[in-house]
Design a protein with these regions (language model features):
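Acidic, low-complexity/disordered tracts enriched in E/D and polar residues
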Residues: 2-65, 104, 129-131, 359-450, ...
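Long, charge-rich, low-complexity alpha-helical segments
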Residues: 62-110, 150-157, 162-167, 354, ...
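SAM-dependent Rossmann-like transferase core, predominantly class I methyltransferases
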Residues: 100-164, 169-177, 181
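Conserved SAM/SAH cofactor-binding pocket of Class I
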Residues: 146-231, 237, 280
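Mobile active-site "lid"/loop adjacent to the S-adenosyl-L-methionine
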Residues: 192-193, 231-259
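Conserved Class I SAM-dependent methyltransferase catalytic core
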Residues: 252-307
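Flexible, glycine-/basic-rich loop-and-beta segments that form/coincide
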Residues: 313-386
């Protein structure tokens, strides 16, 4: 029997799910145990294709046995597993359709299963139990222990809120993680296989303020509105459909665009869409293109922030896509022609935030480049500052703030040869976090930024600058402080 398309039992008794949770807890089947076994620092460093060929030794604890089955994806001898995990473990896992008899001497897992923060998640396997070549399939439920999913999990907002929609939910991991701080969560995906896995994960974790729905994007939640919508859509540009979890059409935007276009109708006032995706920059940058997507659908009532983590040049992407699909030079050239026809200049990967206004005001766009190891808190702070600096009374509040220059800021002074020797050419201020920014600066701006050490108020800095004879006006000074804060040079 082919177990590659097995689905865990999502209609088992609550007693069985509770017993499974107890097994994991008593076995210390935790992130720390996985990291110790693989000698890694985080789950996203697991490389299953390599690890299943490695020998991590005979399991000596129940946690090791569970890790071998569900994370390494290797078979284990039933007697050994029973001695580690207890007499009832095998029958429990069989009832839940999580294991099967591979042969007379070993059992194997039907799924991958692992801890993600405070929940356990089951997904489709990513390797074959018998060591044969692993073949994926169209509606495979993508594992969420790889780096791409880890990035999405990091950006999930955790503040208390009303209902949440996890769109393109796959395993339903976002809905389960956010259920702890949300009134209710909904996991929505288009495939029956994802629905079944999400239902199992919900029951396995004993989380009941969450619902699983099936349909095309927002269709199964028609008429509902949310405080938060989170989505990690299929965004891979493809010539032809590959797998549902990654195929985003020729430009990679077909699903992402619809997620954004239809979001306004499902966001409550003050609600936000968080979308981790790859969007193409064309004649207009990504943030302006996103506003065009919302034209006639709430564009004037939304703020847009796009924080770019990676920028892929089209030639490099075309080469990688050709190699990945085992194509040839003709495929490479066809990719370049396709991007040229669409006017694509680069493929920008990052976090898109769209907020529906809670009250009427002017909308804004912000687009910044972040380091690869970005902190979601910096992105949230950036977006919050853009909102605050457009609020009533902001300028009076600004004068009492004590900004501090970001520790990553550097001042470069360039000289050029001229009459009489070296002459000052210009100043350049650069930073590598929280955003990658480089600006030309005057001596006055360099002097101003040096005043922001976290001990002086903005008002005091203005006074000192005025006393130094800089001759800067109040309005230009405020505008400069706001601009430097927007670029991430200042922290409060």
């Amino acid at each position: 029997m082919d177990h590659s398309r097995s689905i865990p039992n999502d209609t088992a008794s609550e007693a069985d799910y509770a017993q499974l949770r107890a097994l994991f807890e008593s076995s210390s089947f935790t992130l720390q145990a996985i990291c110790r076994r693989f000698n890694i620092s985080k789950l996203a460093e697991v490389d299953p294709l390599r690890n299943r060929l490695s020998d991590f030794g005979v399991p000596t604890t129940a946690a090791d046995g569970l890790i071998q089955l569900f994370v390494e994806g290797k078979p284990i001898e039933p007697g050994l597993f029973t001695s580690l995990a207890g007499l009832e473990a095998i029958s429990l896992l069989e009832r839940l359709n999580l294991i099967y008899s591979l042969n007379e001497t070993s059992i194997a897992a039907t799924v991958a299963l692992y801890p993600i923060e405070h929940v356990y998640i089951a997904s489709d396997r990513y390797n074959s139990a018998d060591g044969s070549q692993f073949e994926g399939f169209d509606d495979i439920v993508y594992p969420c222990l790889f780096e791409t999913s880890a990035r999405f999990i990091r950006i999930l907002p955790r503040a208390s809120c009303g209902p949440v929609l996890d769109l393109c939910s796959g395993t339903g991991v976002a809905a389960l993680l956010m259920a702890r701080s949300s009134e209710h969560t909904y996991a929505a995906d288009i495939t029956e296989r994802c629905r079944r896995f999400a239902l199992f994960n919900q029951s396995m974790n004993g989380i009941y303020n969450s619902s699983v729905v099936i349909g095309d994007l927002y269709q199964p939640v028609a008429g509902l509105t949310f405080d938060r919508i989170v989505v990690h859509p299929p965004y891979q540009p493809v010539f032809r459909h590959q797998q549902i979890f990654n195929s985003g059409g020729l430009d990679g935007e077909q699903i992402t665009r619809r997620c954004v276009e239809e979001s306004y109708a499902h966001l409550r006032p003050g609600g936000r869409l968080y979308c981790l995706a790859q969007i193409t920059a064309r004649e207009q940058p990504v943030d302006q293109r996103v506003r065009q997507w919302l034209a006639g659908k709430g564009a004037a009532d939304c703020d847009i922030g796009f924080y770019i983590t990676k920028r892929h040049e089209i030639e490099l992407f075309a080469a990688k896509a050709t190699l990945t699909t085992k194509g040839n030079e003709l495929d490479f050239r066809e990719w370049l022609r396709a991007f040229a026809r669409m006017g694509v200049r680069s493929l920008d990967y990052g976090l898109l935030i769209v907020e529906r206004h809670a009250a009427p005001r002017e909308p804004f766009n912000v687009c910044l480049k972040t380091p690869d190891a970005w902190d979601p808190a910096d992105l949230e702070a950036s977006f919050a500052f853009e909102i605050e600096c457009r609020s009533a009374g902001f300028e009076s509040r600004l004068w009492g703030r004590k900004p501090r220059l970001t520790p990553t800021a550097k001042l470069e002074v360039e000289h050029g040869i001229g009459p009489g020797g070296w002459q000052l050419s210009h100043y350049r201020i650069i930073q590598s976090g929280p955003f990658d920014v480089k600006i030309q600066a005057s001596q006055g701006l360099a002097q101003l930024l040096a005043l922001f050490d976290g001990t002086r108020t903005v008002e005091r800095c203005f006074q000192e600058l005025t006393e130094s004879g800089a001759g800067v006006g109040r309005r230009p000074f405020v505008d400069t402080v706001v601009a430097m804060a927007s670029e991430g040079f200042l922290r409060w």
